[in-house]
Structure formats: structure tokens, C-alpha cells
Amino acid sequence: MTITFLGTAAANAFPEAFCKCRNCIQARILGGPSLRKRSAALINNDLLIDLGPDIMAASQMQGCPLDDVRYCLQTHPHADHLDLSHLLSRSPSYGVVGAPILDFYASRETLELAAETFERDLAGYSLLSSEAEKHLNLKIHQIQPLESFTVGPYSVMAFPANHAPGMGAMLYAIEAAGCSVFYGTDTAPLFDQTWQTFRQQKMRFDVVILDHTYGPEQPGTDHLSAHQVIEHANRMRSEGLVGSHARVFATHIAHEGNPAHPDLAEFAKQHGYQVAYDGLVLKV
């Protein structure tokens, strides 16, 4: 399994466009891994996690084509994770040739909100209609939390995120070819039910990717902080949910308390995890 980080920032990217805080200034000076687009990830070349606003820029900048994407797991409908205008580029009216069918997976709440937005702002028809399926070469799949389902060659289980009440936000455990990854953003501390299900299902992850919106100087609120990431990683190790060679990565990184990449990476190293950056490719 190959995991490509298309973006690793929180909602407003990093540095933030109009911000002159120390962290944003330093990120602009250093460039490189300190410059972050909004979070999304690609597994192998066919499974996208989040149809985010920056995926096209990431694809072009990283030389990572998306034309073989067959599946999309949508975490939730917030604008930094879901840009429905990308779906219009699947329409014949845009001259698109050869796009494979896209199987799109999301919770009922996410799909209902997306359908309303799509019809109101973009196309004049519902994303859940047969018209959308025909024009966009799209198949919609409604998923439930704590249920397993098959996505092409992948076995997936969705978990309820501790985030955005009423929007059906999801986290995902994904397994293929003997490799297992947990993609855990956006979320505040994981629910007890999630931990219980990890144990009941005897899950054991090779890679864990966690929300790291707030840095070492900030408390976690609606998202995880650096110290909460450390706590989650340590708990996973103590409960045997990760192997001895498993890796834990931070993503969804905001300027609030998170320094530019070199300093944040050094902090993470001292505490047993790593910091993802845009364009990072993991071989699992």
C-alpha cells in the first residue's frame, strides 16, 4: 500500500493567507514542507480520502495524477474537505474523456448536505439523483458508522468522528494486501465506542494518521492537540492496536501553536511520532 499526503493543513491552510503570527512568518521564510495545503490523501492511485479544495493543485505540484481514482471516502462536508465543483469536471459538458466511474462513500448527513449544496449552487439537480449518476459517472454509497464495507480491493470500517455534530463526520480504517491504516481526521478525542470497537475487531494498524490541528502550546477543543496525539499514540501502543514497527503521523496542522515543519518534526520525534507534509509518500 502506498499513501500520498496531498495536503496536511487544517481549514485555512498553513501559513494562513493574511496572518502575521510567528508560525506563519516562519513557514513563509522556510517554504518546502512548512507550506501546507488543506488535508486530503491518496491510497495507491485509486482511493481518495476527501474531495478537498486543493486536490487539483496538489496533483499538479506533486506529479500525482488523479485520473485513475475509482473510489472516494469522504470524511465530512466541511468546505476544507469537500469541494463539490470537482465533480463537475467529470461531466461530458466539460469535455472530460475516459474518467472511470467514481464510487463515492459518505454518511447520510454528509450526502444530504452535499446534495443540497450541489443542486443549489452548481448543477440544478441533486447529487443523489439518477441525473447526477449519469452526467457525472458517479455512484453514491451511504455508509453507517461502525459498519464494515468493501471498496474495490479495500476492506473499510467507518468510525464516528468526535467532530461537527449533525454532519455525520467519519474516520476510516482501511485494509488491503495485509496492510492496515487508520485515517483519523477531523476529530477531537476518539469516542470510547471507537476504542472498544478497535479491541473487539482485534484491529492492528501499520500506520495511524491523526488530527494535529493544535500545537504543543494549545489545548485541544474541537480537534486534537499535539499532546492529545501523544496520548492517543501511547494508548494505541499500550493496547496492542499497532505493531512494533507501526508509524504514527500527524496531519491537519494549523498555525495555532504548531511551529514550521522542522521544529514541529523535532518535537514529534522526541515524543514518538512523525509529522506528515504535503507530497510525503509512505510505502506500507
Predicted regions and their residues:
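Cap/insert and terminal regions of metallo-dependent hydrolase folds
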Residues: 188-283
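Alpha-helix termini
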Residues: 63-64, 90-99, 121-131, 200-203, ...
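Residue-level recognition of the N-termini of beta-strands and the immediately preceding loop/turn
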Residues: 69-70, 100-103, 133-138, 205-206, ...
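Core dinuclear metal-dependent hydrolase active-site scaffold
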Residues: 1-64, 139-196, 280-284
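Metallo-beta-lactamase
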Residues: 98-101, 107-168, 273-278, 282
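Active-site neighborhood of phospho(di)ester-bond hydrolases with catalytic His/Asp-centered motifs
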Residues: 48-52, 69-80, 105-107, 182-187, ...
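Short, well-ordered amphipathic alpha-helices
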Residues: 56-60, 85-92, 114-122, 227-237
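Active-site metal-binding motif and surrounding structural segment of the metallo-beta-lactamase
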Residues: 46, 52-105, 206-208
